[in-house]
Amino acid sequence: MSFIILLLLLVFVGVTRLFQWRKTSSFIKLLLISLFILIGSGLIPRYLLNDLQANYERKPDIQWTSHNAIILLGAGTQLIASTQEFEPTFFSFGRINETASQYKNCAKAQTICKVIVSGGDAQNNGVTEAEVYQQQLLRLGVPLADIIQESNSVNTWKNAQLTSDLMKHHQFDNIVLVSSGLHIRRSELYFNHFGLNVVPVRADYMAAQISWLPLWYNFAVTDFALHEQLGFARYNLYNFMGWNSKREKPGDA
């Protein structure tokens, strides 16, 4: 996404030169160079990432109650060519490990603990994220009897909507939401929209790399951060236009 913005600015430079709009051309060139340096050096992605993750930097001390649910949000699947088997993506393993860790902490409290794996077949691979992630959870010691699959959602909004529908059939008084640090703020917003009071727990923390020379890594993490910011913008726009599902009061789900 950042490269698309820079490419568009480069096209505008060409257009302004064609029409000999020298002042406009100079301004756009300055903007183009400035953005390239600020993104590549890590200054812009550092700001964007801090804005998304700062409130979730410290993981909460969960107070386990009698009926607990730990929600694991999917982040895609990957086909391994040599085995023709599907595994969680690179970005998923942190979420899975954090979920298993939270489950073990919950189990130590000798209370009811369920893991809800939310993720359908968004990539049309013929297998759902919930199925694939469940296998990893089993390997990490989470009992099959304590895993509930929500296998129809294809994005974060549907994760929240369909999981809240599922919750109406259970009596959980404590809900822990696990996702990536970059993604947890928007996830919490969506789950709150559907009436779920959740305790957000980040599985990882993404940071920019400050450098005197532009790094491709910083452009990549900028794109991740911009994707989240666009999600907030879309949510606010849809609310304004009345296109989102009706917001539920916390605890209604």
Which role fits each region the language model picked out?
Residues 21-22, 51-56, 240-245:
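Membrane-interface elements of multi-pass transporters and channels
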Residues 1-18, 226:
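Membrane-embedded alpha-helical segments of integral membrane proteins
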Residues 27-42:
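Hydrophobic membrane-insertion alpha-helices, especially the h-region
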Residues 205, 218, 222-253:
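Extracytoplasmic/luminal low-complexity segments enriched in Pro/Gly and acidic/polar residues
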Residues 3-6, 26-30:
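Sec-dependent signal peptide recognition
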Residues 42-219:
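A structural signal for short, hydrophobic/glycine-enriched beta-strand patches
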Residues 17-28:
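Membrane-interface helix-boundary motifs at transmembrane edges
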Residues 4-5, 40-44:
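N-terminal nucleotide/polyanion-binding subdomain common to many enzyme families
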